[in-house]
C-alpha cells in the first residue's frame, strides 16, 4: 500500500500543552482555574485559597504515581476533567533535584550529601534535568488520553548578551538552578509547549514620562526581546486575562465554559455559575491599554481623526483600527506623541 493513500487534510484537533508563566501574584493559577474542567497537581500549596479540585503532591514519586493513576482513569473514560494543571513547573524541577539527592544517598560513594551541587561536575543538575524531561513524556501520556496539559511557572529576569548588540534583560521561565545548569530543562519545556503565555502587570506612564505599575494585567502570546512567548493558534499578541477567551482560542469553540467538569461531574464552585467572561469590548480595551503609552492622549488623537467620538473609550475603537494598533503599537504611540506636540501625524 502506498503511503500516499494515508494523506489527510485539514486541522487536526488535539489536546494542547500550555505553559503559563509570570511574576508572583499576577494571577497565573487563577487563570488556569478558568481553563476547561481543571484538575490541579499542587506542588507548593499555592491553590489553598482557591475553590478548585486538586491533588497535593510533595515529592517526585508522588507525582509519578498521580500521573499514572490519572492516565489510567482518563484512558478508561472515568476522569471527569479536561485539563491537567501542574502548579508549578519550577517546584517540579525542585522535586527532581531532591530525588537525585535521595537516589545518591541510597548508595553513597563518598558519604551522604544534602545538596545537588555536591555531585561533582554538574552531574547532579544533569540528572535532575533528565528526570524533569522524563516527566514531560509522562504528561504526554496523559495528553494522549485526551487531557489538555497546563504547566504554571514563575519567571525570572535574565541578562541576554547577543553577539551582535548590547546586553539587555528579559523575562524568562524560572527553573531553580543556576542559569547555565537550568538551560536543558527550560529549553525542553519551551519546545514541549504548544503555547507559552506570559502574564504580567501592565506598565503605564505618567505625564512626566515616569513608568508606573498598576493593577491592569495582560497576557502576551508572541515572543519579544523582553519576554518569551509563543502560540500556534493565531492569538492576538496581547490579551486580557480572560480564561474563557483564551480557552476558546487554544482549545476550540467546543471547550465548554470555564470550570465545567466533563461527564456531568459536580462543579468545583458548588453549583454556582462561573463569573461572566469579559465582553469583547472589555477585552479589546485591556489589550489596547497594555500597548498604549498614554490612553488619554490616544483617545484625543483618535477623536481628532474621527475614529471615535467624544465620550467613547478604548472598548469602542473599531475592531479593524484596534487590530492596527496592536500590530504596530510603536508606530501608533509615535503618531500620538507627534499629535500632542502639534506636529504632523502619520
Model-found features: residue ranges?
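P-loop NTPase motor core
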Residues: 91-184
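Conserved GTP-binding G-domain of TRAFAC-class P-loop NTPases and closely related GTPase folds
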Residues: 161-278, 282
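Interfaces that engage single-stranded nucleic acids at replication/repair/recombination sites
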Residues: 5, 11-14, 26, 34-35, ...
